[in-house]
């Protein structure tokens, strides 16, 4: 819709181009004349907007706590540089509420290390009090197998547990700098998850004072 009917330049990661939309994919829109520009980061999208002031540029912001700070940085930089033709269409989500929604559906959560590197482990530790068990895992084969072995060993004891199996990257506090940046620019909102429906407070949107960079408000 934005690319074809509003003549907006869409900046997006390459893996989103062929994802089916409600009516068509970005690849379909591009074949019909829509301007779809592949970027590798939100910073690339902000730079493109700066270099093409005659175009209205919208970055498709997706992902979880790991990718959200980079989007916030691009908005902060755009404001500092006085760029007004840049905004984000935000579909970022946060994991804590998803854990709460799914806590009765699994024996053990294998928590993603890259997310916990940002959020820390406090929530995971708190979920143990609600009977939710889990381990934080890294991404190499050895790290994943270690996390699975630890999880199974603890599970056999029959008590809720939490173990951080990725301590070289994940700490209890997480990245305070990234957390502060996101909290400054964004606030929680309800969000729809495919297959799960609406999960209250699991989405993010720009705060009112940053609304000029929210494509939905533009």
Write out the residue ranges for each language-model feature.
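Metallocofactor- and cofactor-centric catalytic cores in central/energy metabolism, strongly enriched
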Residues: 1-54, 68, 75-81, 89, ...
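Phosphate/pyrophosphate-binding betaalpha-module
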Residues: 60, 64-122
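A conserved active-site cap/scaffold subdomain adjacent to cofactor or substrate pockets
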Residues: 103-167
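Short, ordered loop/turn segments at secondary-structure junctions
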Residues: 15-17, 41, 64, 93-94, ...
